[in-house]
Every structure is written in structure tokens, then in C-alpha cells.
Amino acid sequence: MIEFDNLTYLHGKPQGTGLLKANPEDFVVVEDLGFEPDGEGEHILVRILKNGCNTRFVADALAKFLKIHTREVSFAGQKDKHAVTEQWLCARVPGKEMPDLSAFQLEGCQVLQYARHKRKLRLGALKGNAFTLVLREVSNRDDVEQRLIDICVKGVPNYFGAQRFGIGGSNLQGALRWAQTNTPVRDRNKRSFWLSAARSAFFNQIVAERLKKADVNQVVDGDALQLAGRGSWFVATTEELAELQRRVNDKELMITAALPGSGEWGTQREALAFEQAAVAEETELQTLLVREKVEAARRAMLLYPQQLSWNWWDDVTVEIRFWLPAGSFATSVVRELINTTGDYAHIAE
């Protein structure tokens, strides 16, 4: 399996270096649920600004404050401990009386808003995230500037970030040990992390191989194409290639890559043969995903950061703002800009 650091670049390997996250304020994430609280219901949505504490820790503290079980507090996604993040937590608190959440105190946290809501907030139930990043000690301003311009037009590979695989790739290593020994894994969290890492690594490898082609965004017979922003896909046929290519060029359609698992991958003919060849050597992990009944899925091959803008504070410091849909990684954008100094595998999705 290709290591994350060796995955193919869309815009070529960056010429310069830089520092990501010199301090937490250099990595700001604002969660976008895509909806507002209902104003009624047995749940309470709580918007929290936090710095220096992870999502699970805050959720447990909120449960203790409300005198409810930790399983009654949910969230749409994990946010990084080493960043300034704004996100929603959801607590199930039936009854007409509204707790005074302004009294909730936790170092590094501030309650910004809270309101009643009818439904539980489930993992993944968000529209996306807005990012404000500061890159420091940038060694090649001209190269970064040109890459930002190119990304506006061509996007970046929609790779799963290094953090998906754990510190030092520990989640992927765990999946491989599991596949090789066939020993039952009782810990549900480990099972989830390991299976997710395996499937994500397959996706990254397929995309990396596709990016080696001369025309990355060229539709081929049997490609699975996705309407931009949608989850469903359809298969390209030879007769439609010219029209489908026009729609891909207009960013109306996205070429997808496989998240292998049980069931059909979604591609056919030439595209399917390419994907199967890209991961043909990884038989043990493929067998594991099928055995554990992890359903195959699709994910867009490229990612187009929305509302992308930047401002150079000086010749070596740039602030970058953009919005990404849920499940995408800011570090996959940064990877196309600079060779980062330091390890960012701990950054949450």
C-alpha cells in the first residue's frame, strides 16, 4: 500500500516548505450543520467554541453538567484538540424546563448558543466545515501563490488525510494484523477505526494511480460519475463519453473512486479493471472488508475547495480560508501547497 507521504500530487510536489499549526489559532474550524435548531423538542443543540480540548472530553463534561449519561450527548464530527474549533453538541434532555447552559464552565470552552431541537444529532450529519488556516515560515511564496490559483481551477486530490490512519499509521497496521491473524476484535472502536483505515487506504491508492495518467479528469468507459454534492452515481457508457466529459469539465459531474468492500464497486468495464489492478496486491485487506461486511461505496476523486481566498501577511506568512464538504480533509489541501514541517497526523477530520 502506498504510504500517505508518497501519494501522487495533482499539481506536482511542492517546491517550498512551511509550518502548519505553529499554535492553535493557526487552525480554525467552524462546523456548518446546514440547518438551524428547531426551537422545540426533547434535545438541546449547544454551539461551543473550544481551544485545547477534544470533542469527546467536552461531550462528557456536558453530560456531567446536565446529570445525564454520556451516551445521551452526541455530535456530528470529531474536532481537533490542538485548534480553535466551533461545533455543535446535542444533549437529550426531555422536559419543558431549559437548563441554564451559560453556567457550563470548562477551561478552553465557551457556550455560544443553545436551543431545543426535535432530533438527535448523529455522526456525519453536517454539511461541511469552514477553515481558516495560517501557514508560517513559507519558503517559496511564488510557488504557493501559483498553486492556490491552480487549486481554484483544478482542485486537489480528495485523499483521506493522514489522521484517518492514526499516529504512525497505527490504524492501518491494526487492520493488517487483524486480516492476517483472523482473531476476533471485540473493541467496537478499534473495529471501526481499523476498517475505516483499510477502506480509506484503498481509495487513496486508486486515486494516486489515476493521478499518474496524463489527463486525470478524462472520463473512461465504465466510470462511476457523481452529481456534484450528491452521494448517488451512474455508470458512463461509450456512447455518452463526449457529453459526460463536457459536464465533468464544467464541474457538474465528478469522477469517483472506489471505497472497496462487499458488493459491487460501482464501476464497470475499463474503469473497473483499472481500479481492481490498482489494489490487486492487497488481497488480505480486501478479504477483511468483505468478511466484515463493509459495504463498498464511492467518493469523488477530486475536491474543489469552495470560497477559497488568501491573504499574505508578509512574504513568509499566508492566511487561507475555504469551505469543504463533510468528510473532506483540510490537510489534503495543504499537502498540495507546501511540504509541511512537523507531524499533523493528530489533526481531527
UniProtKB/Swiss-Prot annotation:
It catalyses: uridine(13) in tRNA = pseudouridine(13) in tRNA. InterPro entries: PsdUridine_synth_cat_dom_sf (IPR020103), PsdUridine_synth_TruD (IPR001656), PsdUridine_synth_TruD_CS (IPR020119), PsdUridine_synth_TruD_insert (IPR011760), TruD_catalytic (IPR042214), TruD_insert_sf (IPR043165), TruD_pseudoU_synthase (IPR050170). SUPFAM superfamilies: Pseudouridine synthase. GO terms for biological process: tRNA pseudouridine synthesis. GO terms for cellular component: cytosol. Its EC number is 5.4.99.27. Keywords: Isomerase, tRNA processing. The active site is at residue 80. Responsible for synthesis of pseudouridine from uracil-13 in transfer RNAs. Belongs to the pseudouridine synthase TruD family. HAMAP family: TruD. NCBIfam families: PRK00984.1-4, tRNA_TruD_broad. This is tRNA pseudouridine synthase D.
